[in-house]
A protein has these predicted regions:
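Short, surface-exposed beta-strand-loop junctions and turns on beta-sheet-rich folds
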Residues: 60, 135-137, 203-204
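Cysteine-centered catalytic environments shared across enzyme families
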Residues: 77-102, 129-174
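Non-catalytic accessory regions of SAM-dependent methyltransferases
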Residues: 1-124, 269
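Secondary-structure transition/turn motif
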Residues: 70-72, 131-135, 214
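Short coil/turn connectors at secondary-structure junctions
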Residues: 41, 154-155, 224-225
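Short hydrophobic-aromatic micro-motifs
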Residues: 45, 54, 127-130, 188, ...
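Rossmann-like S-adenosyl-L-methionine
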Residues: 180-297
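Non-catalytic substrate-recognition/targeting regions of SAM-dependent transferases
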Residues: 108-121, 140-208, 216
């Protein structure tokens, strides 16, 4: 049993979404609070007739509670270990782990894994973590420990990249850095294609892992097509299109660093292939000035 002074009581009728297992409580649904609630605190949620509903992290804003559990259970280390282990086992069951052609996958996807406010991407031994709520950030010690216990020797480093993802008004001062170990930039692999990962300076966790299936889908349609990859970042869609047999691929991004990485990634997979051109330009200016016709954009 979990005993907390912090308590939220909902308005009549506002518990319906909770009974449907919606993971958020909106501020407008709250009738009153009990206890000295601070952002990131664990809080118990009750219906208007004082029935226990859920426990979650309190935050200031329109989303007032991100629900962690609908059970009346302790939120301690064993809770975090169970959730993270379950997420890993599910990825293993669907074939994302232990593959010769793939060492990259999203290990934790927030609400999808009943861990709202937490994203963990795995790159060939490095877990890159982003906390999107103060409550999750305050649990980083337990989360680090649970990742290490779950992944064991598959894990060489854990990097926290939460400076830009936490609420800017929160009374904390997060800094990007390693929570465990250390690793240099290196080459990871997705569906047999290689790419440089820059979790220190790159966008998101270093690569848009959640677009894996869309990249693979593009590959199926790219044969003999002229392809334009706008806002290309490091070129993920570009080299999938090339493997799919595209006649030509143009990659456009305003970031010169992203374009450099896109060129490197294409060279890793298709050395000497002249079907690819990369442009460090503002996207809409490129479109205005380009006279090319494209089959896929």
């Amino acid at each position: 049993m979990l005993h907390l002074m912090n308590k939220i009581i909902l308005k009549p009728g506002k518990d319906r979404s909770v009974f449907r297992y919606h993971p958020w409580i909106f501020s407008g649904a709250i009738a009153k609070t009990e206890g000295k609630l601070q952002e990131g605190d664990l809080v118990r949620v009750y219906s208007s007739d004082n029935q226990y509903l859920a426990t979650g992290h309190y935050q200031i804003g329109s989303i007032a509670v991100r629900i962690l559990t609908f059970e009346d259970e302790e939120i301690g280390y064993s809770f975090w270990l169970q959730r993270i282990t379950a997420a890993y086992h599910m990825r293993r069951a669907i074939g994302l782990t232990d593959r010769a052609d793939n060492d990259t996958f999203r290990l934790i996807h927030g609400e999808g894994d009943n861990l709202p406010g937490l994203v963990v991407d795995y790159y060939a031994g490095v877990a890159v973590v982003q906390f999107h709520s103060v409550g999750m950030y305050l649990e980083r010690g337990n989360i680090t420990r649970a990742l290490l216990e779950t992944l064991g020797d598959r894990l060489t480093a854990i990097y926290d990249k939460s400076e830009s993802t936490l609420p800017y008004k929160a009374a904390i001062d997060p800094h990007n850095g390693y929570l465990y170990g250390k690793a240099d930039h290196f080459v990871a692999q997705e569906n047999g294609l290689k790419f440089n990962v820059d979790w220190l300076e790159g966008q998101k966790t270093g690569f848009f892992i959640d677009q894996r299936e869309n990249r693979h889908l593009l590959e199926k349609y790219a044969g003999n097509k002229q392809v334009l990859n706008m806002f290309c970042y490091t070129g993920g869609f570009s080299f999938y299109a090339m493997r799919g047999g595209a006649r030509s691929v143009h990659s456009v991004d305003v970031s010169t660093r992203a374009i450099e990485l896109a060129k490197q990634n294409v060279a890793l997979n298709f050395p000497g292939d002249r079907r690819h051109e990369a442009f460090a330009e503002e996207a809409f200016r490129f479109l205005e000035q380009s006279h090319n016709k494209y089959d896929l954009i």
